[in-house]
A protein has these predicted regions:
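N-terminal catalytic or cofactor-binding beta/alpha core of small enzyme domains
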Residues: 21-194, 199-312
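Acidic, Ala/Val/Gly-enriched low-complexity intrinsically disordered segments
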Residues: 10-17
Length: 312
């Protein structure tokens, strides 16, 4: 895992210097890409679906030739090692899980399609709606404009037609599958919880609370996305393991938490955020010596939640 090249599964080609400052055009061969990975979805054993949208490490090689930052810098936009952190929950305890393989810096599936900055494109349609919300204004909409270090990803305007392909080939594929899984679980058990799993930068946690440090954030749209009993159960399970838990700060939930919450259909959502500092070196993108323990603890909380939901 310390070998970055093999881990991200890309061939790094030379930068295309002719794109510097000009319109940037490239075409991705999506047939080369494995978009999703899923586990335990043929026979869903619990009314719980894990969504891991930001842990992907695969960059299309055409994209890498066209952008400014190197791979290490681009990877700082992802939720490092989050999929691997939860591995015991889906490989040993058989929790149904959907994970995106594609890197977040290429497309962010935890955003609405309209969270887009029209100024990024040289051919943005005049009649197309672009909801330039706070995240897209900061460069972190469905298509990231900047890295986590606020460095520009592109040296010039990009093609909106190319981005439409990203949405069709990756974004829609992820959400169509997640929708089917949540519907299947709800039909089988009478209800379903989508646990949207993320990691958060330690910097924002320390801004909000230096003492005690926020280890875990649970986002439930300020008590709107799931029954309080579920949030309280997860909070207590982490607290028993001596993790400090905050609710709805710094994050109350994003697109998946909001969009998949359908109380009338008894489909609920909860966003889980794990402070990266407690399991990894954020700057070097390496696991710390605490990784295995945190992985064990977080996965056990998820498994306990799965059994709790069976009797809910």
């Amino acid at each position: 895992m310390l070998c970055i090249i093999s881990y991200i599964k890309v061939i790094i080609a030379p930068k295309d210097e002719k794109n510097m400052g000009n319109n940037i055009d490239f075409t991705v061969d999506y047939k080369k890409l494995d978009i999703l990975e899923e586990y335990n979805t043929k026979d869903i054993k619990y009314p719980l679906i894990l969504s891991i949208p930001h842990s992907g490490t695969v960059f299309p090689e055409e994209f890498l030739r066209a952008v400014v930052p190197d791979v290490m810098t681009l990877r700082k936009n992802e939720d490092i090692f989050m999929k691997e952190l939860l591995e015991p929950a889906y490989k040993q305890d058989e929790i149904a899980t959907l994970s995106l393989n594609i890197a977040r810096a290429f497309i962010d599936v935890n955003r609405a399609k309209v969270e887009i900055d029209p100024s990024m494109f040289y051919n943005y349609p005049k009649d197309e709606l672009g909801l330039n919300q706070q995240r897209s204004r900061f460069g972190l909409g469905i298509i990231h404009k900047v890295t986590a270090d606020s460095e520009p990803i592109y040296a010039g305007p990009i093609s909106y037609k190319e981005v439409e392909q990203r949405i069709k080939k990756i974004y829609d594929v992820y959400h169509n599958r997640l929708k089917k899984l949540t519907t299947a679980a709800a039909e089988k058990f009478g209800f379903c919880l989508v646990l949207d799993c993320h990691s958060m930068p330690s910097k924002i946690c320390s801004i909000i609370s230096e003492n005690p440090r926020i280890d875990i954030c649970l986002g439930n749209l300020f008590e709107q996305s799931c029954p309080n009993k579920i949030s309280f159960f997860v909070e207590n399970e982490f607290s028993k393991r001596e993790y400090y838990v905050a609710k709805n700060r710094p994050y109350s939930g994003a697109f998946i938490t909001f969009n998949y919450c359908e109380p009338r259909k008894k489909i609920h959502t909860l966003q889980l955020e794990v402070n990266r500092e407690i399991y990894a070196d954020e700057k070097l993108l390496r696991k710390s010596d605490k990784f295995q323990q945190v992985s064990y603890d977080v996965s056990k909380v998820i498994t306990s939640l799965a059994h709790f939901l069976l009797d809910f």
